[in-house]
Regions:
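Compositionally biased terminal segments of proteins
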Residues: 1-193
Length: 193
């Protein structure tokens, strides 16, 4: 008979601590927490009606391609496609996405206190950064989501299975930048700066 979990958040916290211990402290606990919260945000995007409107890019994509050995990323980056650029509209979209329940992951998001600000205002298509708070058991974690617009993906977005820290959780499949676009964007950033 399977043991009934009463507090998924506490159980996940213990599992993440075990991963830290089992790695010989190679993975710092706070980095694993940040990755876990990013992962569970991505899960909600992947099962939402907006999953085809947000294409994963940036550090979270590099993590998906390379696994645990990449540097930790504190935000999640998306290219938005076929969706309004209006900040208030996007805020409503993310309230809807972040309210998708997933009891087994132990995470909830404070959808009442999402804030946003414009980013990359010097570009032809300015983006938006959302600041959100994730909660798990007694842990409160602040994170951000950067949304960009107008980039070209060559040849086209690819389907990516996002690696899971805790295998018991529902899996994540997202649209993501192609590796060619990742490399081109990195070169463009180096030249632009």
């Amino acid at each position: 008979m399977e043991k009934q979990v009463k507090n998924y958040g506490r159980s996940i916290r213990e599992k993440l601590l075990n991963i830290t211990r089992d790695s010989g402290q190679r993975y710092q606990y706070m980095y694993l927490l940040a990755r876990y919260f990013n992962e569970r945000l991505l899960y909600r995007v992947s099962v939402s009606q907006y999953k085809d409107n947000f294409v994963l890019k940036g550090g979270s994509l590099l993590y998906a391609l390379d696994g645990l050995d990449t540097r930790p990323t504190v935000d999640v980056d998306f290219l938005a496609e076929k969706i309004s650029r209006d900040r208030e509209y996007l805020e409503g979209v993310f309230r809807e996405i972040l309210s998708i329940p997933c009891e087994k992951d132990g995470v909830t998001f404070d959808i009442a206190h999402i804030t946003s600000e414009p980013i990359t205002v010097e570009k032809k298509y300015p983006g938006t950064r959302f600041h959100i708070t994730a909660l798990m058991d007694t842990i409160v974690h602040n994170m951000s989501i950067d949304i960009g617009f107008g980039d070209v993906i060559t040849p086209c977005p690819e389907s990516v299975d996002f690696p899971m820290l805790i295998q018991d959780n529902p899996s994540i499949n997202l649209q993501a930048y192609s590796i060619e676009t990742v490399i081109a964007e990195k070169f463009h950033t180096m030249i632009d700066r």
